[in-house]
A protein has these predicted regions:
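A glycine-rich dinucleotide-binding beta-alpha-beta segment and adjacent secondary-structure elements
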Residues: 186-200, 347-353, 411-472
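C-terminal segments that line or cap access tunnels to active or ligand-binding sites in enzymes
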Residues: 316-429
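Mid-domain catalytic core of redox enzymes
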Residues: 255-366, 507
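Extreme N-terminal leader/targeting segments of oxidoreductases
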Residues: 1-12, 31, 444-451, 498-530, ...
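Rossmann-like flavin
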Residues: 100-208
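N-terminal glycine-rich phosphate/pyrophosphate-binding loop and immediately adjacent elements
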Residues: 6-143
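Short beta-strand to alpha-helix junction loop
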Residues: 165-176, 218-239, 389-397
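Helical element adjacent to the flavin cofactor pocket in flavoenzyme catalytic cores
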Residues: 213-264
Length: 576
């Protein structure tokens, strides 16, 4: 039995209307609590916000949605459904991977489509290895989900469960890169199933194999896009919460918490005082701890994940060979991780995520125009350039990235940009994110599960944390779970799983939208590294089938200014 908030918990204030806060609010409402949600911005979403710029509707946060049933659980808590409120479009391919040798691969979640694509790309032996890998990923997910991901921890003793032995038997405590190498010998394919470790802030060669569960979410469970953009998800969650009786108060920053002994008795905003029996705090950890007036002691300080530079570009043209999500891998893969996590330097041969949301939803841009989001991982401000350095470095790095994209086949991209938004670690820092990163604490072994900052804070009886900095961690699915787990700490009632029939996401094309009205080359041997064939080229089309990082954006103001538009408390990555 895990610990819960003692005493009365009828009135709950949730601080932050991001994905974590809205998930917590819906689960609390479903358990009969009276819920007030306070949000500093003028609309819901947190990092999964929206910026309107000259007719471009820009998602300021996560671009990848996986495992939508976890979001549906929150809707189900108040008797409604995600699939009734948001049209989810399955992405085929989920990603397109482009490599420095000129080859490309479409990544599909369907087993047969992906096996056929792997065989085209790397031969029958690798396709057989992919099938074995897929089976292993499914078993790994089943061993982890209920006990180690969708679970609260009060101590490391919570790990002692038969599923721990199952996880060990599956090789979950080995190294990720080595374990994937048991199934796939092609280095390019191994990258497709290990790059997700960057979400966890650990290079694949050092990450636990258990983190392959993130690859399961991306490559097996499927990737979706809400019509109207990712912001359609938190908007629908906020509407469902309001319909269930929540009091949502926007544009009200929290200034302090009132306490009596070990309990928080009220949340104070610049608009007034809100009495409470319990509070759920979803801001980034430094902000939450500052409000609480206490910081838990850790033998070692938290180690943070890499950050990201994101350029959001509204253009007068596109490059049709770009998929919705295209990963452009540099040749210097292992060097990249050393630069990001050890040397603290910008990538010398960058691996980039290019997202083209208008490939799926043209209504996100003016007629005849297109949106492209370019995400470049970079060091956080603890080990890399500090916030002040980015005032000059940001614009120069933006130019470097555009030149590199031109070299990789996006001819004329700089000239095509009509409107743009840029975010750097300085902006994350200005919004209160530790180490200037939206990806929070890295998922090292010492910062995972019961070793991650817990959602109950010692010395405070009735405050619970949610968001990417606490359990389970970074990413849209896990941030949604963090809200559910926080609600369970208040109510003592675990969120219900599978409590009612759900519509299939694949059938979501007929679902009604609520709220916002708008709401892979041949299998030839690779060329030598450094050869000039690295282009974002179209992939060979595979048979018909049946990459979160979180991003943020601002219209480029004077360097060092805080970002415009909605932002945090959490990803996706993959945060919320």
């Amino acid at each position: 039995m895990t610990r819960t908030v003692p005493g009365p918990t009828d009135r709950v204030v949730v601080v932050g209307a991001g994905l974590a806060g809205l998930s917590a609010a819906l689960h609390l409402l479903g358990a009969g609590r009276r819920v007030t949600v306070v949000e500093r911005e003028e609309l819901p979403g947190g990092r999964a916000g929206r910026m309107d710029l000259a007719g471009y509707r820009i998602d300021t946060g996560p671009t990848v949605l996986t495992m939508p049933d976890l979001a549906d659980e929150a809707f189900a808590a108040v008797g409604t459904s995600l699939y009734e409120r948001v049209e989810l479009i399955p992405l085929h391919p989920a990603y397109r991977a482009c490599f420095a040798d000129g080859s490309s691969l479409d990544v599909h979640s369907g087993a047969e489509a992906m096996a056929a694509e792997v065989e085209r790309f790397a031969g029958a032996a690798e396709a057989a290895g992919y099938r074995r890998l897929r089976d292993w990923l499914q078993r790994l997910y089943r061993a982890q989900m209920r006990r180690f991901i969708d679970a609260d921890f009060d101590s490391p003793l919570g790990l002692l469960h038969p599923d721990l032995a199952r996880l060990a038997a599956l090789g979950g405590f080995g190294r990720l890169d080595a374990r994937i190498g048991r199934f796939l010998s092609d280095e390019r394919l191994r990258r497709v199933f290990t790059f997700q470790a960057l979400y966890a802030g650990v290079p694949p060669a050092r990450a636990l194999a258990a983190y392959a569960v993130i690859a399961y979410m991306d490559t097996v469970a499927g990737v979706y896009f809400p019509r109207g953009g990712m912001h359609a998800l938190p908007r629908a969650m906020a509407e469902a919460a309001a319909a269930a009786g929540a009091d949502l108060r926007y544009g009200q920053p929290v200034t302090r918490l009132e306490r009596s002994g070990g309990r928080v008795t009220a949340v104070v905003t610049d608009a007034g005082r809100i009495p409470c029996d319990a509070v759920v705090l979803t801001p980034d950890l430094p902000v939450a701890y500052r409000l609480l007036g206490r910081r838990p002691h850790r033998p070692l300080g938290l180690r943070h994940s890499p950050s990201a530079v994101v350029l959001h570009a509204g253009t007068d043209r596109t490059w049709p060979h770009l998929a919705h999500h295209t990963i452009s891998f540099g040749a210097a893969w292992h060097t990249t991780f050393d630069e990001l996590t050890r040397a603290g330097s910008l990538m010398s041969d960058p691996s980039l995520l290019v997202t083209r949301p208008t490939a799926t939803d043209p209504g996100l841009a003016p007629p005849g125009r297109h949106l492209h989001y370019i995400l470049a991982p970079c060091p956080n401000t603890d080990i890399g350039p500090g916030p002040a350095a980015w005032s000059d470095l940001g614009p120069r790095y933006r130019d470097t990235l555009l030149r590199e994209l031109e070299r990789r086949g996006l001819d004329g991209i700089e000239a095509a940009i009509e409107e743009e938004c840029l975010v750097t670690p300085a902006d994350w820092h200005a919004r209160g994110h530790a180490a200037g990163t939206p990806f929070s604490a890295a998922h090292t072994f010492a910062q995972t599960g019961p070793f991650r900052p817990r959602n109950l804070v010692r010395g405070t009886e009735n405050a619970v944390l949610a968001g990417c900095g606490t359990t389970p961690g970074v990413g849209v699915p896990t941030v949604l779970l963090s809200g559910k787990l926080a609600a369970a700490r208040v109510t003592g009632v675990p969120g219900r799983r599978g409590s009612r029939p759900r519509s299939s996401p694949a059938a979501a094309g007929s679902a009604r939208q609520s709220g916002d009205p708008a709401l892979t080359g041949s299998g030839a041997a690779p060329r030598a590294r450094g050869e000039s064939a690295h282009r974002l080229a179209p992939a060979h089309q595979p048979p018909a089938s049946s990459p979160d990082f979180p991003a943020a954006a601002r219209q480029s103001p004077p360097p060092g200014s805080p970002p415009a538009g909605p932002t945090a408390p959490a990803t996706e990555g993959r945060t919320g």
